[in-house]
C-alpha cells in the first residue's frame, strides 16, 4: 500500500469518431500486440454493420445498450473461513462492471461461429443490446451463482 495516499484515476481519452470514452476502452481491450489501428478498423466496421442491422437505431446507442445489458451487479468471491471455502456474493463496483462487460463481449465475440471478427462483433453486440447472446448468458450465470450463495452473504469483508 502506498504511504502517500491513493493515486488519482486518469480520465480515459475519448474515441475520435464517436467521442465516447467507452468506445475507446472497448477498442483498447480488443487490441492485440499494440495494433490499435487494426482494432479500431474492426470496431468501426462492426459499428457500421450494427447500424445497418439495428433497425434504424444509432450504432453508438446500440453499443452502449449492449454494454449496459452485459454489466453484472453481483459476483461471487471465494472466502476461506475455518478450513472451508465459501463463495460469497459481493456487489461489483462501477469500473469493474464496465470492464467485465467489455471483456465478456469481446471474448464471446471471438468465440462465435461467423466468419471474420467484424461480423462476430456486430452480431454479439446486437444480441447483447436485445438481451440475448453469450455475454448476457454469462451475466445471468454470475447472478445465478450469487443468488445461490446468498446464505453466505454475511461473510462479506
Swiss-Prot record:
This is Small ribosomal subunit protein uS7. Belongs to the universal ribosomal protein uS7 family. It comes from Koribacter versatilis (strain Ellin345). One of the primary rRNA binding proteins, it binds directly to 16S rRNA where it nucleates assembly of the head domain of the 30S subunit. Is located at the subunit interface close to the decoding center, probably blocks exit of the E-site tRNA. It comes from the Bacteria. InterPro entries: Ribosomal_uS7, Ribosomal_uS7_bac/org-type, Ribosomal_uS7_CS, Ribosomal_uS7_dom, Ribosomal_uS7_dom_sf. Keywords: Ribonucleoprotein, Ribosomal protein, RNA-binding, rRNA-binding, tRNA-binding. One of its GO terms (cellular component) is small ribosomal subunit. Part of the 30S ribosomal subunit. Contacts proteins S9 and S11. The gene is rpsG. PANTHER family: RIBOSOMAL PROTEIN S7 (PTHR11205). The keyword rRNA-binding applies. The keyword Nuclease does not apply. Gene3D superfamilies: Ribosomal protein S7 domain. One of its GO terms (molecular function) is tRNA binding. One of its GO terms (biological process) is translation.
